[in-house]
C-alpha cells in the first residue's frame, strides 16, 4: 500500500457555510501527518469524513485502502479516533470506559494490554475513579488508551493536547513518537506550532482549503507571515509597589490528602504571575481558594485587600475567573452567556448592551453572537470564556490553564 490515506477533491458544506473545498492529500504508512489551522478551518469536519462519521458532498477518500462510504465498517475496525472533546463516558470509571471501548470492537483489555500498557499504567492507580473527576491530562491518556484498545492501523487525533498542561502535552507527544516507532500511522490536528515539529509532514488548512503540504520547517517558512506574524506588540505592565495578592502558609486538605501544602507568595498590582506544574500539583485548588470558591484548611491570604477566608464575597466582586473547563452555558447563545455573567457581576442592562458588540468584534465573534455555545469550536469557546471573565473589568483575573 503506497498510501494509507488518500483524499481527492473532498468538499463539504453545512448550509451556506463551506467547511471543506476541494481537499486533496495523501498519507504514507507509518507517518505522523499533521493538520494545522485556525478554529473553523475544517480540520474536525475532515476527520469526521475520514472516520466515516460524516459524508462528503463531493470527492473521494480512502483509509487503509477502503472507500469511506462503501467500506465504512472495515475502516471503523482499522481506525482509532480521539475527538477534540475526548469521547469518554463521564459517569463511568476509568476501567469501565476502557472495557466499554474494548467490547465495542469485540476484544478485551487483557488481549491488547501490551499496546496501551505504557499509557494506561500512568492512570491505572485511578482505575476506579469516574472519568468526569479526572484532570485534563488523565482524561487525555484514558481517551488515547480507548482509541488504541482494538489495535488500529491508523490513529486520528483531533487537537488532543488542547486544554492540558505543558508537562502532559510533552508526555503525550513522547507517547505518540513511541507508537510511530511501533509502526502506527498517526494523523493529528494541532493548534500549537511547537508540536508541528514532531510531525513528518504538515498540511496547513485555512477556510476549508489546503494551503500547502510539506515538512514542518518548510511550512513555517512558506507561511511565516500567517503562522508567525510580525508586528505584534504589548503594553509594558504598570507594576506598582502594592500587592494585589498576599498568601502565607496556605493549605488545603481533602481528608488525608493534602492538595496544597503551606504555600506562600505575593503578587504585585499590574504583574503577570504564573503557576507552573503538572496535573494534580494543586494549581486549580490554589486558584479556587484565592477566588473565594473553596475555604482553606490552614494559612491565610488576601486578594484585592480582602481576606479570602472571611471576606470571600467581596473577593468575588473584584476578580474575574476563567476555569479550566470554561464555565459556559452550552444551551445559551453567545450573547446570552455574556449577559448572564455580566448581570451576575452587577452590570446594568444599559452597560451590557453598549459593550457586548464591541467586545465580540474585538474577539472576532460578532458573527457568532446568536450561535449556541455548544456549536462553537473549542478555540471560540475559549475566547468567549475569557470575554465573560473580563467583561466587568475586574482588578484581578485568574486564568486556570486557559490554553
Language-model region placement:
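Conserved ABC ATPase "signature" region
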Residues: 99, 103, 108-126, 339, ...
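Hydrophobic anchor residue at the start of the ABC signature
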Residues: 144, 386
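Catalytic Walker B motif of ABC-type/P-loop ATPase nucleotide-binding domains
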Residues: 155-158, 397-400
